[in-house]
């Protein structure tokens, strides 16, 4: 095994569906990310598996599924580039009880401590595999490793036993030390194309065509988010409420805007979903104003409302509204006052 830096940027899904049924087709079950899959399979077939890999990408992009399939394939008794799903090793891996695939856990929600890394990995890695060619450690949420934990882990990554493979999964790889990054094969899972997401929702989850198109647009290339949207009755309520707001905000008196903000205070955990819907709606309005094309709209069934807003608002006004949504999202991420942030955004929508 060789340690080297190899960065793959793939313009194609974490959907963390790592139960047995989701593995039944191996890598074929993964939506997109073909370049990354090919790289992993080539490493296996050429016997050039590295000691450390870093799977980067936002939550829901597919990191956990990709890493789990890679680990399962490495341990498969058929020694192919896909897990066979039938051997004892694959069955144990599917059931998450494989003795040589270790998932590192942590007690505190926001940190992985040096003691947890020492106990579950550093001390354990010196014990040879129980029944497999590799001993594989999966560290999910690796961005939560403390500085001390990272420094301790670095020594193992630099001088690992020949059989050790460490798979780090991180929403934000930049939170890791440059010295760790430089010693890992970095595989960055980027958003999947909307058509791939739509096809997945229709074929695998039996979502109707129009709804699949809307869900795919709202998911923004994230299969995990697309699944959540398609399965969640609560999201339907969010969608209806958000569309009601954008359709009528221009005629709302100030007291009704303030009442809307009060209701949204209870939805703070889902506020990013509202911002996504607001942005897509006004993008549709701007697109329709410029082209009169209906087929390119996300919310085709809302054509009357989109046409009415397009006739009322100027190009400059629509651009101001879209910018105000982006600013509101950034302000809330920076912990600016919720009510004030939402009021400024809604007033921009109303006045433009």
Q: How should each PLM-predicted stretch be described?
A:
Residues 141, 168-173:
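A short beta-strand-to-loop transition that corresponds to the Sensor-1 phosphate-sensing loop
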Residues 2-148:
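Clamp-loader machinery-focused feature within the broader ASCE/P-loop NTPase space
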Residues 16-18, 24-72, 89-92, 162-164, ...:
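Charged, glycine-rich active-site and insertion segments that engage polyanionic ligands
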Residues 151-168:
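Conserved catalytic/switch belt of AAA+ P-loop NTPases
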């Amino acid at each position: 095994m060789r340690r080297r830096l190899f960065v793959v940027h793939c313009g194609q899904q974490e959907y963390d569906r790592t139960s047995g049924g989701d593995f039944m087709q191996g890598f074929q079950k993964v939506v997109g990310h073909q370049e990354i899959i090919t790289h992993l399979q080539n490493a296996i077939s050429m016997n050039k598996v590295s000691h450390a890999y870093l799977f980067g990408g936002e939550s829901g992009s597919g990191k956990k599924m990709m890493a789990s399939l890679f680990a399962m394939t490495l341990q498969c008794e058929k020694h192919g580039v896909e897990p066979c799903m039938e051997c004892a090793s694959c069955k144990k891996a599917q059931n998450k009880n494989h003795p040589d695939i270790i998932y590192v856990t942590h007690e505190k929600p926001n940190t992985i401590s040096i003691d947890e890394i020492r106990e579950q990995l550093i001390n354990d890695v010196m014990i040879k595999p129980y029944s497999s060619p590799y001993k594989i450690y999966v560290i999910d949420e690796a961005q939560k490793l403390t500085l001390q934990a990272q420094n301790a882990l670095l020594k193992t990554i630099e001088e690992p036993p020949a059989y050790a493979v460490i798979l780090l999964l991180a929403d934000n790889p930049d939170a890791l030390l440059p010295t760790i990054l430089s010693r890992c094969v970095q595989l960055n899972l980027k958003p999947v194309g909307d058509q791939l997401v739509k096809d997945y929702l229709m074929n695998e989850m039996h979502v109707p065509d129009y709804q699949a198109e809307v869900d795919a647009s709202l998911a923004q290339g994230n299969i995990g988010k697309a699944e959540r949207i398609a399965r969640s009755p609560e999201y339907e309520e969010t969608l209806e409420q958000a569309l009601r707001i954008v359709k009528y905000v221009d005629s709302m008196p100030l007291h009704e805007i303030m009442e809307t903000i009060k209701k949204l205070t209870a939805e703070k955990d889902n506020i990013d979903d509202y911002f996504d819907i607001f942005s897509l709606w006004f993008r549709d309005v701007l697109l329709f104003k410029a082209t009169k094309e209906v087929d390119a709209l996300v919310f085709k069934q809302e054509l009357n409302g989109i046409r009415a807003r397009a006739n009322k608002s100027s190009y400059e006004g629509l651009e101001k509204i879209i910018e105000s949504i982006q600013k509101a999202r950034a302000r809330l991420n920076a912990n600016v006052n919720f009510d004030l942030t939402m009021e400024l955004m809604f007033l921009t929508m109303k006045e433009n």
